[in-house]
């Protein structure tokens, strides 16, 4: 999907349609854009850019707070549309899906793509556009979809079709990796494709280079997304405090919101954690420092009450009269594992009971303890 988050905001709010729009995690000048509309990109505004810089580039840019639940709803609608067109659909991210064309002949590729775009337009809205790439594997198809944006359609039949691209245009190659490849005399995509498996492995310094050799040649056994972990081993959030929150009271308010967000993600991924780390950094005119504390390591727990109590106890260990002003706060749940892999105590309630409790308690917690609402009220 093209500029997924900002397109949803434009679709659901007429005043944003065809206007430069960026989406931010919270409404403050001290954050960055997580999405930018194509109208905003025309002014040089892009994802990852600070709000202050975006406003400098175009003072009238619309700054919209992210609404994750709306994006999930639109994602689910999109997946249902795809399942009507294809037998097998693999979700790569909230705005990326890979579809199997095994039962569709090559002469029907364009018609199927046009039909899919039409359904997205009718059911999701005129602001929602997608770029479709077709190739032998997911990696090449992703590259193809990025070649003509927005609302593009591209077929890549061979790695030779990529020769006109820059190395940094390929997913998985950033500026740091590009410099590393340059040291191995790899300056273009053609240079990359001309090397054998052993040479690429040497250039990467790991087996990843060998995987690239096969991905570039359309291999399905070594493809994009196959080597990313589905379940995070840590879940963390950090926040730089805005000027009006640089007090211990303000820092604690943000700290509570971060804990709630972390617990939300534990529930979302159905994870248990063994340890909680917290930190508060501070600055003064002459010095700076950071307080870091960790909870005792436990067998594993997904109990929200337990972790909230641990968070409060850890916060109490931070001196109230710190030498400077609070600058940032952060939390991190570590050693996470899937709930189904937790060894339960013989004296605890069965897992189904905990699931039942979450089923009925979670909606209340979201309604009355929404961390996003806490940010809105405090910033």
Role assignments for model-derived ranges:
Residues 92-96, 127, 135-138, 271-275, ...:
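Short Gly/Ser/Thr- and Asp/Glu-enriched loop/turn motifs at secondary-structure junctions
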Residues 122, 134, 145-221:
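Compact, charge-rich alpha-helical regulatory domains located at protein termini
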Residues 113-137:
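Polymerase palm active-site segment centered on the conserved acidic dipeptide of motif C
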Residues 44, 54, 95, 132-133, ...:
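A residue-level signal for conserved active-site and pocket-lining positions in enzyme catalytic cores
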Residues 182-325, 341-343:
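DNA-contacting surface of Y-family translesion DNA polymerases
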Residues 1-94, 98, 116, 214-216, ...:
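Residues that scaffold, gate, or flank divalent-cation-dependent active/transport sites
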Residues 98-118, 148, 185:
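Catalytic palm subdomain of template-directed nucleic-acid polymerases
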Residues 7, 296-379:
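Acidic, metal-coordinating catalytic segment for phosphate/diphosphate chemistry
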